[in-house]
Amino acid sequence: MPYEIKKVFASLPQVERGVSKIIGGDPKGNNFLYTNGKCVILRNIDNPALADIYTEHAHQVVVAKYAPSGFYIASGDVSGKLRIWDTTQKEHLLKYEYQPFAGKIKDIAWTEDSKRIAVVGEGREKFGAVFLWDSGSSVGEITGHNKVINSVDIKQSRPYRLATGSDDNCAAFFEGPPFKFKFTIGDHSRFVNCVRFSPDGNRFATASADGQIYIYDGKTGEKVCALGGSKAHDGGIYAISWSPDSTHLLSASGDKTSKIWDVSVNSVVSTFPMGSTVLDQQLGCLWQKDHLLSVSLSGYINYLDRNNPSKPLHVIKGHSKSIQCLTVHKNGGKSYIYSGSHDGHINYWDSETGENDSFAGKGHTNQVSRMTVDESGQLISCSMDDTVRYTSLMLRDYSGQGVVKLDVQPKCVAVGPGGYAVVVCIGQIVLLKDQRKCFSIDNPGYEPEVVAVHPGGDTVAIGGVDGNVRLYSILGTTLKDEGKLLEAKGPVTDVAYSHDGAFLAVCDASKVVTVFSVADGYSENNVFYGHHAKIVCLAWSPDNEHFASGGMDMMVYVWTLSDPETRVKIQDAHRLHHVSSLAWLDEHTLVTTSHDASVKEWTITY
């Protein structure tokens, strides 16, 4: 195999303020599940750096749940499609697909024999359905609510019971199969966000936006108590999860805390304060084996520490929004990956372990469009917030210095030796020296798009929407147009010099990469065809003999300079999402990022 996936650094859950986020547990206790965009992410609970991504939904996925057998996962999306797929093989073959109703699926529950599924959400005519997993035949009706149903659960022992919670401020109780509506529970005064049966089936709990948690008898539906008396939390409660032994309950709230309750004596055992900002609101939780997980509005997944509630054991960070750009850099003998996303967030990753964090302090406030590292070890990033930032990779702290404010929005930045950087903006080209603007071309006469600086530091190549690459010289503190045009095959989308400066690669919207030979006066060296859609990014391997291109066709090609026919094709590098950026860690390791908010490392062999 000329390529194989080496590592997957998965995205965070996609979260929305005021909406509960479901994290699915694994009956075997190894993994946990959540969704982001069109992806379902499976992660190892002991080592979250081990991840697998399922991308077969055509629409945004909302919820995914393991069957109690552990062999299948059911996932539901905003269009009302429910897919049931295999977990035992890497391919995740589809077993069944259903459309229980037209509209967003918000929660899924299985019976303990993995044979029946209940699905709820916001359909047009109905808000829920319960059916056999292998035929889709109905095994009851979910009625009794007049608004969207947020949550459903089924008692995991016979006789079966089913409970739902809805935006009509009510929970409902069903007996079955076939499941029939028994009664409505109107104890809450606000939306009911979550209902969950205890693993032994003796109790079920409901949690609501009114800050209350009520406990009921699992068999009869009679009210047992209100946790914490008058109020369980000072804010809305978005999620609850029972301990495996059914004695305790974990709750997650908009008051920025999670709590553990001892249900039998109705008391709080631990309170986990998660922070003071809006992003610290708790929207989801999972209690699996000894692990207590909660999800913050920031998308971060917190591993809670019962022995020290004030500080999580571990926080999984990363991106929850699409990644736009990436760069790599060796620091203290280790290779790090730096990725910048659509929301202005920059993350750094240890390329070996996947350990990652974001920079300290206040950084970009809008999409990070391009990043590169200069010779003094500073990360230079340009963003839609109209700034270029210089950030020390030793400190990894956004300092008040190191921000260059531009007149117009920058699109791309490239660095050369001697403290030079060239920024391409909308209708403007700016030369920076030692973090200061020293020259600009205000009306270049074409729309510049991308820029590369020759490793020698004297020549700048700028690609335009008009399909040409123009060459400029850096003379002291000015840029001089050399008057030389290199023709691409379409609007230029990226340009890159090889590390030895011998070649310039240019990719375009017409699906072609053209390589020019620098020593021969930029004569055309070779043309590379293969992509099925616009190419958006390029990166040269350190060996200067190979380069990679990524496109809107979800493909990555690794090309051989001397022979366009010798190529490695990575199909569906990021399935259903186009490749946004590429970089090489070494001659055989390629890193790709995409709008699926994940980072992947590939081993390439020639």
From Swiss-Prot:
Changing H145Q: In PFITS; uncertain significance; almost complete loss of protein expression in peripheral blood mononuclear cells. Its main location: cytoplasm. It is found in: Cytoplasm; Cytoplasm, Cytoskeleton; Cell projection, Podosome; Cell junction. WD repeats lie at residues 4-45, 48-87, 93-135, 138-176, 180-218, 224-263, 270-306, 311-351, 358-408, 432-474, 480-518, 523-561, 566-604. Changing V424M: In PFITS; uncertain significance. Coiled coil: none annotated. One of its GO terms (cellular component) is podosome. This is WD repeat-containing protein 1. It comes from Homo sapiens. The lineage of its organism: Eukaryota, Metazoa, Chordata, Craniata, Vertebrata. The gene is WDR1.
